[in-house]
Amino acid sequence: MPLLHADTAVLDRWLWLSKRLPPASGQKMLLDVGCGSGAFTIGAALRGYNALGLSWDERNQNVAIERARMCNAKTAEFQIQDIRDLSKREDLFGKFDVAICCEAIEHIIDDEKLMRDIAKCLTPGGKLLLTTPNYHLKPIDPAHEGPFPTVEDGGHVRKGYTSEGLLRLCDEAGLKPESISYCTGFVSQKITHLHFATRKIHSIFAWLVVNPFRIFPPLFDDVVTRWLQYPHYSICLEASKPN
């Protein structure tokens, strides 16, 4: 599974997603908007979804295709697509039961348009699962402290979102918000920081150092984060398209 090589923040997002992605019979369609190297697309496919991952990065898509092959995720498909141009993909409109968008919207200047375009791709009653940096986070990466560019160069164009900001985006896209929650607390953030630091030496070394610590966030992260009143890294939105 590609998630074995991911940092703990990515694992946190998958745990959040998987609780909201019950096993499917193969009839459910899922769209991964800004899929990166395909970890969540593959994870959804292995849970029985017909999953389509979109990303502009050809290298990442090639990695995703190879990972899907290795994982025998036969219902995972990947297409090269700039998500800023999702409105041009009329073939995807009204097709998907679920759309996921994890840590992607903060890279897009016209976030309102992206939300509207995702909503167009959902079936009536379809669900959006979205994660993005929490505006109140304490940055793990110095690049997340700003200043932020006014052009889309692949990095973050804003620090993150508040719950009010996500609710406003839902309203403008015609989506009904169902819940807002958070993931990646203090323990997970510190392990992720260790992963980033050791990865500068070598990716395999980073994996060997960090892997023994992966058991701790599911056990202690929520308790420690509440006790310290520490801001979570990601804010998570669950919304649906009205029937």
Report the location of each language-model feature.
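Short aromatic-enriched loop/helix-cap "lid" or pocket-rim segments at secondary-structure transitions
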Residues: 92, 139-144, 189-195
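A short His-aromatic
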Residues: 103-107
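A short glycine-rich, Lys/Arg-flanked "PGG" loop and its adjoining helix->strand segment in the class I
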Residues: 112-124
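Short, glycine-/aromatic-enriched active-site segment of Class I SAM-dependent methyltransferases
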Residues: 131-157, 168
